Amino acid sequence: MSVAAENQDSATMYEVMKGTVSAREAIQHTPSCDIIPANTILAGIEQELHNVGKEMTLREKLRDEQTGVAEEYDYILIDCPPSLGLLTVNALTAADYLLIPTMAETFAASGITQLYDTYKSVKKYTNPALRIDGVLLTRTERTRVTKTIQELTGKIANYMGADVYRTTIRSNVIIKEAQAVQENVFDYIESKAHRG
């Protein structure tokens, strides 16, 4: 969602993962959703988590009886970086379902198969209840290339026992603009409408 912390002193997912603040304390409320923002410092958490069971850290932070927030929400979306490191493993371990967003680009298909391998490992060792909900194509355009990639993605999804959503996210300058100003898309659209 590309949302930064409200200010430099706001707690982020980094502090939650490190254990210096609770998930509840880090939540920021926006008109459209509640978020726990992240920043580039979060990438360093992989070097800092040395404890046994480090792949369970996020699950424990979200589900803790005293300080967790999992029971307060119908849905919690965990937006992961495009890597398959400890942060992604933590997210998969904490999740009930895996929604795989993938760009409608040729090389993105190989990323799906790599993620599937990680999914199988997490399912085997840390979260046997994890299920693939589906594959969501992003940055689509009305071109033959996109249609070809949709077909390829469909074959890969079928191999994984998943479906490709009929809904896609088309290429849109508003998404890029929202990322540039570090706002979630919904708030950005609303603020843009008020600006005229």
Describe every region a protein language model picked out.
Residues 1-196:
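P-loop NTP-binding core
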